[in-house]
Every structure is written in C-alpha cells, then in structure tokens.
Regions:
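Radical SAM enzyme core and accessory elements
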Residues: 170-176
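Secondary-structure boundary/capping micro-motif
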Residues: 184, 195-198
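Signature for the C-terminal beta-barrel architecture of outer-membrane proteins
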Residues: 1-162, 166, 179-182, 186, ...
Length: 222
C-alpha cells in the first residue's frame, strides 16, 4: 500500500445531429509520483509506452513487461431518438494482445481484458411527476482492471487505522461490480421532483472467481 497512485485521463466528444454523442476516453493509472508530462491534454498515453520506464526490481526478464502502469480505453455513445428516451453504451478495455504480440511473444500469457455496458431509459411525464423505466446490462472479462500488482491495477486502495492493517480495502475504478461479472438491472419508479420518489430495482449478477478483490491477497506487492 502506498500513496503514489494517480489516474490521468482525457476524453474527446463528438455530437452529431443533436441526437448522438460519441466519446473516446483514454486513461493511465500510474504507481509513481506526479509527472507533468501526463497533464498534456494532447498526449496519447499509450504511444508513450510508459510501462517501459518504471522497471520492476523484482523481475527484469522482459523488456515489454508492464510495470507500475495500468492503461484504460473507453468508447461511449449516447443516443436520444425522441424526447425522454435515451440509449447508451460503453466499450472498455485495459489489455488487448494484438496478433503481432501473440505471434512474436508466444510465451507471453497476458490475457485480454475487455468489458461492455448497454442500457436504455425512458421517462413518462404524468400529472405533477414522472414515471421512469430503465434497463441496463454489463459484461466484464475475468481480468478487466487487474494487472500484475494491486499497486497499478485499476482500484482505489484504502487502509484502516484500527484492526488488521495487513489487508487494505479495494474499490474498483470503473464498474463497481469489478471484473468477471455479468449483470442486468431493471429499474422502474415514479417521482415528484423535489418531494418524493418510489423505485423498484431488480439486480441480477453472475460472478466468477476473479470478481472479488481477494485475488490481490496473493499477488506480489499486496
């Protein structure tokens, strides 16, 4: 556990025909002190290959070993075909092995790490209030957000002043459900703005063995 954890991110938005918005978001999570080079809004983080600049003292066997950094790429859209109706989606990725990498580095077992989210929301005004109907689904591959160490995996890290300090608390940066999860949520409700609201929410999740944060308990650097 240490405090030198910083998330740098920038995004580019395009709005088309007043109905469709497309967003490209890039981020880099760095286990190192603040560096001004990451604050340039026009920098392509992945093009800098910063993982090569933070050598892992415990393992220098591979030049391309990712160390002290965790990359994030997101593509989002929001589509409003008519008033009060919205559809949205997100594709997220923290690792992808190209065909060049798999063919030239056959011993590299780094898994792909991708996920997606898709949903819709409809608002029906009635009397002085409004009904809301929403449906959302998400999928995350087993190693989304997870890197070689919790110190540069995409998680927030907390520690207690009391109790057992050996195991810190982790909170995923991104989906609160974390990796290795399929989820679906149905939300229906009625509200009178600034007065009262009543909602029915049903959440279903199917979670695998990598979905919790206990995976970090056995990782180097935890």
């Amino acid at each position: 556990f240490n405090v030198d954890l910083y998330m740098y991110a920038h995004q580019f938005d395009i709005r088309l025909f007043k109905k469709l918005t497309i967003t490209a978001l890039e981020g880099i999570f760095v286990n190192a002190p603040v560096e001004l080079r990451y604050l340039n809004p026009f920098t392509i983080f992945h093009g800098m290959a910063p993982w090569r600049e933070y050598p892992d003292e415990d393992d220098d066997s591979s030049y391309d070993r990712e160390s002290h950094t965790g990359a994030y790429l997101g593509i989002k859209f929001q589509f409003t075909p008519v008033s009060n109706l919205k559809f949205y989606g997100l594709f997220a990725m923290t690792q992808f092995q190209t065909s060049y990498e798999t063919s030239n580095y056959p011993d590299d077992t780094t898994p792909n790490a991708m996920g997606g989210q898709l949903g819709g929301r409809y608002i029906l005004p009635v009397s002085k209030g409004r009904f809301t109907f929403a449906l959302e689904g998400s999928y995350a591959q087993p190693y989304l957000y997870i890197k070689e160490s919790p110190n540069w995996s995409l998680v927030r890290t907390y520690a207690e002043n009391m109790g057992n300090k050996k195991y810190p608390f982790y909170e995923w940066i991104g989906s609160p459900f974390g990796p290795d999860t399929i989820s679906g949520e149905l939300n229906m409700g009625y509200e009178v703005p600034e007065k009262w609201a009543l909602n029915f929410i049903y959440l279903f999740m199917a979670r695998g063995e990598m979905s919790g944060t206990s995976v970090f308990d056995t990782m180097v650097g935890s």
